[in-house]
């Protein structure tokens, strides 16, 4: 450092010293200035000070940095010089003085250690990435989390669902207003199961049989409801006077009177006749035994309980005809009713239990199901047991409650309309209540409900016969209050006429019944006639489905049902005169001369009918046959002039009696009746009063047989048509028929002398009106009972000062005389005097419910509308008009000709043949309908299937009314349903009435349990519509008496529950338990809303005793069912050669474990078991809104049709169009249920499309109707639970749920499917479908583009045309590749063309066809067996299958088959897997790789790393659920000794487990279990594939051939001799297997038997390539083995086709789905 620098530093220091005092001085002066508050330099001084402070701060910082930098630089320079100069120099110098010696061995060992450590490091870090792809460790916890999440999802709907189960009126049966009305009762805590809520629930459960009820209707129906308590043992007589009874607490036994043995045998013999016999021959054989009065009724004057018929008029007529036929000349003959047949017997005939002595105790009777009543009132047998929540009244009793009031109107003083339970109409018991009910009902019909006290007193005094003393009534003590005597002695019944009904109820326990009295139904019918008709329609439908259908299909009582139509034709008489018949016949003949009758006469309506019933092949054959025979159909609407407004309104209350001029247009010849053609004619015969009717006063005075209708004579030529209604041969005669016989001249005048305008007086109008009047007559409709009296629906009493009495007791005659009767007197609201203001306010708040009834709903208007729909049809002889068990077409009135009514039965030797042809059925003629008769009556009432077949016996001319028109008009003129109910109930036979009392209608909501395993079997069930799942718990079978009590045991038992199957519409179950008197062997749970018919065990036993034919029929059905179930599980025969057995097919394979650690699935353990996956109803439900549901459904429906399934798709639009005006009505639920049940019968598959918002009722309907729910989701969307899915969970449905993931491209991102499935434990299966949705999105985005983009899109559209493609192809040949690539990049960047995705070239690989085959139970499976390198031939078999166009829907494999099958299932394409398999074979055949993998042979010779890596290189991170095609592989669990089936998890891991050959590879560890090769238990898993629902299976076996050479070496064996024997070429003894070979054979014992069983499995195509010359480890011969498989596959499939053994491949001959956009998909080129 020099002196200049020192001087410079000293100057700086001195300068700083001079500055500091100045700074301090300035600061001090500044402070003084501030203190003084004055000074002009304050601002300048402050600014100077701030600048100085900033300068000083930055100076200090810079000084510190400069000093630190200088020190760091000097230090670093020193360290670098030390390391680079001094230290190396020291090492070099010192190294010259040090000497190190290392031996070569140490060097080699050191290098080996370094190499091994490096290799293990690289192997563990880089080459073992597959180890991270382990199995899901916490499977149990995952499932528990899923269940918890599902429970959380259900938690939101817990209260609503609990209320839904308890309130049976939830949106389906009763209105929401009903919920509101009872919200005070049910609105409390659901956990409090109080008696009151239970009572209301039971009542609502029973009243649901009425269907939907409006709130005012429900209030009026139930406001007079009573409750009655019955002590145990008390007996309730069931007749119409009781009303509608419901058991709300306890149990009630229903008893039916025991039929006498003689009658029983006679009747049973009637229905055990030969096929050639008919009902007419039966009746003719019985005719001499029974006689009738001139009324056509039977008077049984026997004692109560013993009905011995005798002749009344003494004349027994005999017929000379061989078979009685219904013809116009024989309708005056009296046919005995079945009621009389069953109630007549000789005095000498004993009871059914004649072996029992009269001294048999009552307890013995009760033990056998019988009870006896005192004083000879009869013996009764148990029919059914009614529990709480079920109605006591039968369906016919309910109909009688509505129709009985009408009888009171027509005959106020009659003896009473007879209940079906009574035998004698004269001796019907009457009481004060019954009288008051009848007169009240009569007043209701006349619009005068309120009675003055004078009228009431007059009624009680003027009818003393009906007011018998209550003290003398034996029934007044039979059902009494708690204070009365319980068992009084009955007084003798000589003083009064009294009969016990045939059906009684006895309290099995202390019970409570709720009763709606009959006057409530009478008032309901008068006040709300439309609602009453809806109830009647509901009851008629249930009567048809429950009673008729069960009797027809299950019990075989078709003749009983057909007898109803026989009685109708015998009872009602309406025949057309000959001149009208000639009009019809001549017109058909004229048309036949000029033109083809088939084309010229078929009306649009009839052609529509023919096309509507092509749902199945049977209907197609029938309709095609009928279309050939149907010669002509005359549409009268073409020629009939339209009525003017003036002519259509001419009908007035006062009839106009004008003449009727008919112009006969079609006469081509002269007939004797031509003189009458220009004479005023009436279609109704002007008969004398004695022939037309009788004065009602005369009937009051006379009850003798002379007061009957005269017999009808045969129609003569030119005779006018006559209306003559026969009285019903049953005792309960309908009022609609008695109306025609009344002596009221004004009414008869209105009917017989209806005037018509001049426009109507044509031949068409005459024929039309005549046919309509005939059909309405058969329906029980006339002008009197179709009129609506004015003021009857006003709802206000005619006399404001009247009052009504509401009885407290059940029936006034039943009340005990000891207890005083309490009467509540109620005054009308008019008695209260309120202010006008309050009255107006109350009137505004309350909206009065009033049904809108058109004033044109009278007989004449109905007749005119019916006439417009009448058609004339002509059938040739032998034409099948209506076939049995097909939809009835409508109502037929026979104008001329004969129709045979036949029924078809299956012969006994064919009942077990499931493949029988329908032509082999026996046909039996029941009766014949001649001119003037009616056909198709029952099937047209509810528009359902016909129970019989109608065949034209001769050329037949009929008047036809289509069922669509009949249903529409009956719905408009709703009073027709009342008349139909009257007619139908009067025609039912006693046996049908007994069935109606005993059969129960059950309705189950989704997830409801019908019965549990271990419950007593109390009946047989027949599924009317819906679906049930059968569950079985093996643990409960082992210990049936010990049931788990705590939650843990219940959970464990639930895990072991297995699904045995599912039952659909028309199937029955429970017969085995009832026949064997054992408990239920399984549980039944409703998959969706289900309706069932229950045949009680007591009824079945009763029918078995009375009618053995029914018992035989049911036994055959049970035997057939058991035989069908046992064929799959029966012991297969042992296949042997001579006396040496070769295969024992009964050796069982270890089943797949059902525990959670062995089940690799996200759902149930049986999620993949689809052996009965023939779903009838499928619902397509999106997970969230915005998905193309309709487009997807359209493709799926089209695919179903291509695979041969008759399918219909339903969305909200099609359903609303069917419902018509009821679309938004509360009646839509009832209409929907019938419509859906009908579609399930017409079509094999019904697809419900949920195309509405989530809160829509249609969405809920789709979920409730589904056997299988398909959840639609877009694969690349978020896997969160959508709003539709939450609705599905809230519905608590147990239907099978499938997830469909839609992909734009035919590839799946690894792990993507798991994200969808792990949070959805309710999903049973999933599918990957290619469905390009960008087309829909891009089409909507075109509108938002600008003008330039629109021009480019126009160019793009031109390119897509055919001309544009040709031009583009020609240009592309001339341009170089570089220019073409530039143009393509430009177009893709600027023109925004639609993205094009790849689809497979082969059409049979269509994803929708694959989904349709799986859902319809027609899936095609491929099973690839194990065999080491021999399995490389699988690739050649796959190539042959693809070239043949055979699709594969499911793939399964073992060992090498699992590897090849997994690769094929992953891509579903042969080209990309070829290279992967070849690469894997090269790695395995590499000697150096195998040597590098050797280890110490304790467990195996290799570590398995190279093998694992080879598999992982082929599959990567892909999981099995990511495979495009469904796939599974098997393995052997040596820890649990079971077979494992893997369909979820990482693919490489379980494929490796299936290929783990013992000794060569170590077992795969999976959740604590060791897995080995699946070939040890089943080398060809065909049975698993069969259990998954595959109908056709191609099984490829490449295993080694078993050495079955017989050995003979004695009882001891020397090892040295074995070695010498192997070396000796001249030895005759075969080589003895070594220990290793014996162990291998021992391991494959189960597999060998499984293979033989798989070969004999139906539907399996066994393929065995010639690969015996190749060893297990010959992977180096890839090309050779592959070619062997390809060549053999082509030859094998070709031979199958030539020999006709190739199975039918559904959809193989169909083109691709027609609506796929061809320009939207591209085909993948054939390159790896």
Curated annotation (Swiss-Prot):
Coiled-coil residue spans: none
Record's GO cellular component terms: endoplasmic reticulum membrane
Basic and acidic residues biased stretches: 153-162
Biased composition range(s): Polar residues: 293-303, 326-336, 406-424, 454-479, 599-609, 642-657, 729-756
Broad class of where this protein is predominantly found: endoplasmic reticulum
Pfam families on file: cNMP_binding, NTE_Ploop, Patatin
Chain ranges on the Cytoplasmic side, renumbered to this chain: 1-44, 119-1728
UniProt-annotated location(s): Endoplasmic reticulum membrane
Composition bias type Low complexity, residue spans: 141-150, 610-628
This enzyme's EC code(s): 3.1.1.5
Annotated motif GXGXXG, positions: 1426-1431
Membrane-spanning ranges: 45-65, 98-118
Domain PNPLA: 1422-1586
Gene name in the database record: NTE1
Domain of life: Eukaryota
Stated name of the protein: Lysophospholipase NTE1
Chemical reaction(s) catalysed: a 1-acyl-sn-glycero-3-phosphocholine + H2O = sn-glycerol 3-phosphocholine + a fatty acid + H(+)
CDD domains: CAP_ED (cd00038), Pat_Fungal_NTE1 (cd07227)
Function comment: Intracellular phospholipase B that catalyzes the double deacylation of phosphatidylcholine (PC) to glycerophosphocholine (GroPCho). Plays an important role in membrane lipid homeostasis. Responsible for the rapid PC turnover in response to inositol, elevated temperatures, or when choline is present in the growth medium.
Keywords, in A-Z order: Endoplasmic reticulum, Hydrolase, Lipid degradation, Lipid metabolism, Membrane, Repeat, Transmembrane, Transmembrane helix
Disordered, as annotated region: 141-167, 285-368, 406-436, 454-488, 596-660, 687-756, 1034-1055
Listed Acidic residues bias regions: 345-367, 1036-1049
MF terms (GO), sorted A to Z: lysophospholipase activity
Regulation: Inhibited by organophosphorus esters.
Lumenal topological domain: 66-97
EC main group: hydrolase
């Amino acid at each position: 450092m020099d002196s200049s620098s020192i001087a410079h530093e000293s100057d700086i220091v001195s300068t700083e010293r001079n500055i500091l005092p100045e700074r301090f001085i300035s600061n001090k002066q500044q402070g003084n200035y501030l203190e003084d508050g004055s000074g002009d330099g304050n601002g300048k001084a402050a600014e100077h000070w701030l600048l100085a402070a900033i300068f000083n701060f930055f100076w200090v910082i810079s000084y510190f940095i400069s000093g630190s930098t200088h020190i760091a630089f000097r230090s670093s320079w020193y360290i670098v010089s030390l390391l680079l100069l001094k230290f190396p120099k020291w090492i070099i110098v010192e190294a010259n003085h040090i000497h190190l010696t290392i031996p070569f061995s140490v060097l080699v060992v050191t290098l080996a250690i370094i190499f091994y450590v490096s290799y293990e490091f690289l192997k563990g870090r880089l080459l073992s990435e597959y180890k991270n792809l382990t199995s899901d460790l916490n499977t149990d916890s995952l499932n528990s989390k899923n269940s918890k999440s599902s429970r959380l999802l259900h938690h939101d709907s817990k209260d609503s669902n609990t209320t839904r189960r308890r309130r049976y009126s939830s949106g389906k049966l009763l209105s929401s207003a009903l919920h509101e009305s009872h919200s005070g009762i049910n609105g409390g805590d659901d956990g409090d199961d109080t008696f009151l809520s239970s009572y209301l629930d039971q009542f609502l459960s029973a009243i649901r049989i009425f269907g939907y009820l409006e709130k005012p209707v429900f209030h009026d129906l139930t406001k007079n409801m009573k409750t009655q308590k019955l002590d145990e043992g008390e007996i309730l007589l069931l007749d119409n006077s009781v009303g509608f009874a419901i058991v709300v607490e306890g149990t009630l036994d229903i008893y039916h009177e025991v039929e006498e043995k003689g009658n029983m045998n006679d009747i049973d013999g009637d229905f055990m006749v030969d096929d050639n016999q008919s009902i007419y021959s039966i009746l003719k054989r019985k005719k001499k035994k029974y006689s009738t009065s001139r009324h056509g009724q039977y008077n049984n004057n026997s004692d109560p309980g013993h009905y011995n018929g005798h002749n009344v008029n003494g004349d027994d007529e005999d017929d000379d005809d061989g078979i009685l036929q219904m013809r116009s000349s024989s309708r005056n003959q009296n046919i005995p009713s079945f009621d009389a047949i069953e109630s007549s017997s000789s005095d000498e005939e004993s009871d059914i239990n004649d072996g029992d002595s009269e001294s048999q105790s009552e307890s013995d009777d009760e033990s056998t199901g019988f009870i006896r009543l005192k004083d000879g009132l009869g013996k009764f047998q148990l029919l059914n047991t009614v529990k709480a929540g079920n109605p006591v009244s039968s369906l016919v009793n309910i109909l009688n409650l509505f129709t009985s009031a009408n009888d009171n109107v027509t005959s106020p003083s009659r003896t009473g309309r007879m209940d079906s339970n009574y035998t004698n109409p004269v001796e019907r018991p009457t009481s004060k209540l019954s009288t008051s009910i009848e007169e009240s009902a009569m007043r209701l019909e006349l619009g005068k409900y309120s009675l003055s006290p004078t009228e009431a007193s007059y009624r009680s005094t003027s009818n003393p016969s009906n007011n018998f003393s209550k003290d003398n009534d034996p029934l007044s003590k039979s059902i009494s209050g708690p204070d009365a005597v319980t068992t009084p002695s009955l007084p003798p019944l000589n003083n009064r006429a009294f009969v016990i009904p045939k059906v009684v109820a006895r309290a099995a326990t202390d019970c409570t019944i709720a009763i709606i009295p009959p006057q409530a139904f009478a008032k309901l019918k008068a006040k709300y006639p439309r609602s009453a008709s809806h109830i009647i329609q509901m009851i008629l439908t249930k009567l048809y489905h429950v009673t008729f259908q069960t009797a027809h299909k299950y019990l075989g009582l078709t003749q009983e049902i057909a007898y109803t139509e026989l009685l109708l034709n015998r009872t009602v008489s309406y025949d057309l005169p000959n001149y009208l018949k000639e009009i019809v016949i001549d017109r058909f003949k004229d048309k036949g001369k000029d033109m083809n009758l088939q084309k010229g006469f078929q009306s649009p309506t009839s052609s529509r009918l023919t096309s509507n019933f092509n749902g199945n092949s049977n209907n197609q054959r029938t309709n095609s046959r009928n279309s050939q025979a149907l010669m002509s159909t005359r549409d009268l609407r073409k020629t009939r002039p339209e009525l003017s407004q003036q002519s259509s309104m001419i009908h007035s209350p006062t009839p106009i009696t004008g003449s009727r001029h008919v112009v006969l247009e079609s006469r081509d010849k002269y007939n004797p009746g031509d003189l009458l053609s220009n004479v005023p004619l009436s279609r109704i015969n002007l008969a004398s009063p004695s022939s037309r009717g009788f004065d009602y006063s005369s009937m009051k005075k006379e009850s003798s047989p002379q007061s009957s209708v005269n017999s009808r004579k045969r129609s003569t030529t030119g005779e006018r048509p006559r209306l003559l209604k026969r009285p019903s041969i049953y005792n309960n005669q309908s009022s609609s028929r008695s109306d025609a016989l009344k002596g009221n001249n004004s009414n008869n005048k209105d009917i017989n002398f209806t005037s018509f305008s001049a426009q109507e007086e044509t031949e068409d109008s005459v024929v039309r009106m005549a046919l309509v009047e005939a059909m309405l007559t058969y329906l029980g409709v006339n002008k009197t009972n179709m009129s609506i009296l004015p003021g009857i629906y006003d709802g206000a009493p005619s006399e404001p000062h009247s009052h009504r009495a509401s009885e407290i007791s059940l029936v006034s005659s039943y009340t005990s005389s000891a207890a005083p009767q309490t009467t509540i007197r109620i005054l009308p609201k008019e008695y209260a005097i309120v202010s006008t203001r309050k009255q107006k306010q109350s009137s505004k708040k309350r909206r009065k419910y009033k049904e809108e009834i058109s004033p044109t709903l009278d007989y004449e208007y109905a007749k005119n509308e019916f006439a417009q729909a009448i058609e004339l049809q002509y059938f040739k002889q032998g034409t099948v008009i209506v076939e049995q068990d097909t939809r009835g077409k409508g109502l037929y009135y026979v104008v001329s000709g004969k129709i045979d009514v036949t029924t078809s039965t299956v012969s006994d030797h064919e009942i077990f043949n499931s493949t029988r042809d329908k032509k082999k059925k026996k046909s039996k003629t029941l009766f014949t309908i001649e001119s003037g008769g009616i056909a198709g009556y029952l099937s047209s009432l509810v528009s359902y299937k016909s129970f019989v077949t109608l065949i034209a016996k001769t050329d037949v001319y009929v008047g036809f009314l289509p069922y669509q028109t009949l249903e529409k008009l009956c719905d408009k003129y709703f009073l027709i349903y009342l008349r139909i109910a009257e007619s139908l109930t009067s025609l039912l036979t006693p046996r049908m009435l007994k069935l109606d009392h005993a059969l129960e209608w059950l309705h189950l909501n989704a997830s409801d349990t019908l019965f549990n395993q271990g419950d007593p079997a109390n009946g047989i069930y027949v599924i009317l519509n819906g679906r049930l799942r059968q569950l079985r718990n093996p643990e409960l079978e082992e210990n049936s008496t010990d049931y788990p009590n705590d939650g843990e045991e219940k959970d464990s038992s639930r895990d072991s529950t297995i699904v045995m199957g599912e039952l659909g519409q028309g199937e029955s179950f429970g017969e085995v338990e009832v026949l064997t008197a054992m408990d239920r062997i399984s549980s039944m749970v409703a998959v969706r809303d289900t309706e069932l018919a229950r045949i009680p065990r007591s009824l079945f036993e009763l029918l078995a005793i009375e009618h053995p034919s029914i018992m035989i029929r049911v036994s055959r059905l049970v035997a057939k069912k058991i035989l069908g179930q046992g064929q799959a599980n029966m012991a297969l025969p042992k296949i042997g050669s001579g006396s040496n057995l070769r295969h024992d097919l009964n050796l069982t394979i270890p089943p797949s474990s059902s525990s959670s650690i062995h089940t690799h699935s996200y759902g149930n353990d049986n999620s993949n078991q689809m052996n009965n996956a023939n779903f009838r109803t499928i619902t397509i439900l999106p997970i969230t809104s915005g998905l193309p549901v309709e487009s997807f459904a359209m493709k799926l429906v089209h695919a179903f049709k291509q695979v041969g399934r008759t399918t219909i798709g339903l969305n909200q639009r099609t359903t609303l169009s069917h419902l018509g005006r009821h679309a938004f009505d509360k009646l839509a639920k009832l209409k929907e249920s019938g419509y859906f049940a009908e579609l399930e019968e017409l079509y094999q598959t019904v697809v419900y499309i949920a195309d509405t918002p989530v809160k829509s009722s249609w969405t809920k309907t789709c979920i409730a109707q589904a056997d299988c729910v398909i959840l639609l989701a877009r694969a690349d969307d978020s896997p969160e639970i959508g709003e539709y899915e939450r609705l599905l969970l809230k519905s608590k449905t147990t239907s099978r749920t499938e997830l469909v993931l839609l992909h734009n491209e035919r590839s799946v991102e690894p792990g993507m499917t798991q994200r969808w499935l792990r949070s959805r434990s309710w999903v049973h299966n999933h599918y990957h479908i290619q469905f390009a949705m960008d087309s829909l999105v891009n089409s909507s985005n075109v509108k938002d583009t600008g003008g330039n983009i629109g021009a480019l899109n126009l160019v793009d559209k031109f390119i897509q045309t055919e001309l544009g493609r040709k031009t583009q192809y020609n240009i592309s040949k001339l341009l170089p590749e570089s220019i073409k690539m530039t143009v393509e990049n430009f177009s893709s960047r600027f023109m925004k063309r639609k993205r094009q995705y790849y689809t497979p070239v082969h059409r049979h690989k269509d994803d929708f066809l694959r989904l349709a085959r799986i859902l319809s139970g027609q899936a095609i499976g491929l099973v690839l067996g194990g065999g080491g390198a021999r399995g490389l031939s699988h690739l050649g078999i796959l190539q042959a299958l693809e070239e043949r166009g055979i699709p594969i829907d499911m793939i399964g494999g073992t060992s090498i088959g699992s590897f090849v099958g997994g690769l094929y299932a992953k891509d579903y394409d042969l080209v990309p897997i070829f290279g992967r398999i070849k690469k894997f074979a090269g790695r395995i055949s590499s000697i150096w790789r195998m040597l590098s993998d050797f280890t110490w042979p304790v467990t195996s010779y290799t570590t398995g790393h190279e093998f694992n890596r080879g598999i992982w290189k082929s599959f990567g991170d892909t999981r099995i659920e990511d495979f495009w095609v469904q796939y599974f592989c098997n393995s052997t669990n040596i820890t649990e000794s079971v077979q494992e089936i893997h369909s979820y998890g990482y693919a490489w891991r379980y494929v490796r487990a299936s290929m783990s050959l013992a000794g060569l590879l170590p077992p795969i560890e999976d959740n604590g279990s060791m897995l080995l090769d699946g070939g040890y238990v089943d080398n060809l898993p065909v049975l698993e594939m069969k259990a998954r629902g595959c109908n056709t299976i191609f099984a490829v076996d490449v295993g080694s051939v078993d050495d079955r050479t017989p050995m003979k070496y004695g009882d001891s064996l020397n090892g040295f001799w074995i070695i010498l024997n192997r070396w000796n070429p001249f030895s005759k003894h075969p080589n003895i297997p070594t220990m290793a070979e014996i162990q291998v054979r021992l391991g494959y014992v189960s597999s060998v038997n499984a293979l033989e069983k798989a070969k004999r499995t139906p539907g399996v195509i066994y393929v065995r390539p010639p690969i015996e010359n190749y060893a297990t480890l010959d992977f180096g011969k890839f090309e050779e083995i592959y070619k062997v498989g390809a060549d053999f596959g082509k030859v094998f499939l070709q031979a199958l086709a030539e020999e006709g053994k190739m199975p039918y491949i559904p959809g193989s001959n169909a083109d691709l789905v027609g609506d796929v956009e061809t320009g939207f998909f591209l085909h993948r080129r054939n390159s790896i």
